[in-house]
Amino acid sequence: PIKSSAASDVYKRQAWEFLTEVIKLDKNRLYVTVYPDDQEAYDTWHNDCGVEESHITRLEDNFWEIGEGPCGPDSEIFFDQGPEHGCDDPNCAPGCDCDRYLEIWNLVFTQFNKMPDGSYEPLQHKNIDTGAGLERLASVLQGCKTNFETDLIFPIIEATAKRAGVTYNENPNTDVSLKVIADHARAVTALISDGVLPSNEGRGYVLRRILRRAVRHGRLLGIE
């Protein structure tokens, strides 16, 4: 059986408080998912956080593991972007492959150790891993369709489009190149600021490949 801890309940309440009271997202547009056997997580969301039962979904996918080693049930928080982003399926809900429900927060309660034979043993020292998507939260707060249109990234797209003499959102192929350059420019900046330089091995080779791909998309836009 899945057993949560007092600490995991606190993290759920803090996540909910941050989303609804600090950045003031509409509670009616927030949905949560839990592992089917994690009744305590379900009760915490419903009884302690006030999440309506219709906004809580039990999903088999809500169990985090990467092969052998520490693992456990998780809860995810989704933001409903509206039916215009959906698939028109009347049963559409968090976990659907369409774009209606955007995952913005994940809380993992690591309480098991997966053994080589596939069995699960309780961990002596349990822990909680929680995180939110900064760019996804920004897209929700700013009413943007994608992360690329937030004020974190779009200025790079605008500058690149101006340099190339193109307009964003007019040609799908052009948009792909603009997004690749914006994304790669940020990655390159982070790597170089961490002391990485282009080379033939290790992190330097990764940086080199990222630079090459950004340059290739720049040439596709006509930038020499």
Task: Tell where the protein language model's regions lie, with residue ranges.
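Single conserved hydrophobic/aromatic residue that forms the stacking wall/gate
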Residues: 1-7, 11
